[in-house]
A protein has these predicted regions:
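Acidic/glycine-enriched connector segments
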Residues: 2-6, 10-119
């Protein structure tokens, strides 16, 4: 049986982090969450997964490039079977994460919220 690995990424300034928590809480038991170590969406995803006892793959922040992409961004998607990206509609970094997920043909859903929708 193939493990389900969900890459979760997004903007540091994403305005409604409850979206991230609710998504993680909806995942089936045993799902592996892959996320970076940045503030915002990454932190919310790791926190929610840890609170549920889901395994977490953490992609450390490194300044290396892999195939023209930041190594950290590529690492978030390594082994992912699907991705959920939470975007404020402005972050160029998150826009790049969307492109990486598409490049690796990972089924991806992008959730966009206007920064004016703050919690």
């Amino acid at each position: 049986m193939t493990e389900t690995v969900v890459a979760i990424a997004g903007s540091r300034m994403y305005p409604k982090l409850d979206d991230v928590t609710n998504f993680v809480n909806s995942l089936p038991e045993g799902t592996i969450v892959s996320a970076g170590l940045a503030a915002g969406v990454d932190k919310a995803a790791r926190k929610a997964a840890n609170e549920r006892g889901l395994p977490v793959n953490e992609a450390p922040m490194v300044a290396l490039m892999v195939g023209g992409e930041p190594a950290h961004d590529v690492a978030v998607f390594k082994g992912a079977t699907q991705a959920r990206i939470f975007w404020d509609g402005k972050s160029q970094g998150t826009k790049g994460m969307i492109a990486i997920a598409q490049k690796f043909d990972i089924p991806t859903k992008v959730v966009t919220r206007d920064p004016e929708d703050a919690e």
